[in-house]
From Swiss-Prot:
Protein name: Probable NADH dehydrogenase [ubiquinone] 1 alpha subcomplex subunit 5, mitochondrial
Subcellular location: Mitochondrion inner membrane
Presequence range in chain numbering: 1-11
Function: Accessory subunit of the mitochondrial membrane respiratory chain NADH dehydrogenase (Complex I), that is believed not to be involved in catalysis. Complex I functions in the transfer of electrons from NADH to the respiratory chain. The immediate electron acceptor for the enzyme is believed to be ubiquinone.
Length: 169
């Protein structure tokens, strides 16, 4: 009787399976997440402060780390974050750590301001069975609205018309 009354609530907190093939239950998921998020925040320091990637990673990692520190229960962590199971969050955190290493290696923010990229144009004909996904013409209402905005702002922006070849393409 005692075990039924006390044991059941304790057993309810133990996750038996993730329900995702190949994704095993992590019994100490909270501790693993806290460790991974802390490592992520240390690793991202190598990325320049003004980079959007660093700002985004720091922002969501800090938020997730705070939730993990505030909540003891894995169910509450999953509920508050709303990003899947804790095991999925662990995989995401590991992937983010790997990506940070790659980003530091690739150094995409180290491109000089005067760098010019070579544009390669391919004039080969496109086979008929390949869709070209060209957007259709803009509706007349778009041009009316644009002209109204230009008239209101009273700037010297030339009015756009449907006959402009740049706007039709």
């Amino acid at each position: 009787m005692f075990l039924r009354a006390i044991g059941r609530p304790l057993l309810a907190k133990v996750k038996q399976t993730t329900g995702i093939v190949g994704l095993d239950v992590v019994p100490n998921a909270r501790a693993v997440l806290i460790d991974l998020y802390s490592k992520t925040l240390k690793e991202i320091q190598a990325v320049p402060e003004d980079e959007g990637y660093r700002k985004a990673v720091e922002s969501f990692t800090r938020q997730r780390l705070n939730v993990c520190k505030e909540e003891e229960d894995w169910e509450m962590i999953e509920k508050r974050l709303g990003c899947g199971q804790v095991e999925e969050l662990i995989e995401e955190a590991r992937d983010e750590l790997t990506l940070i290493g790659k980003m530091i290696e690739w150094d995409p923010w180290g491109v000089p301001d005067d760098y010019e990229c070579e544009v390669i144009e391919n004039d080969a004909p496109i086979p008929k069975h390949v869709p070209q996904h060209r957007p259709g013409p803009l509706p007349e209402q778009f041009y009316k609205t644009l002209e109204g905005l230009i008239a209101e702002s009273k700037t010297e922006i030339p009015a756009a018309t449907p006959s402009d070849p740049q706007l039709k393409e």
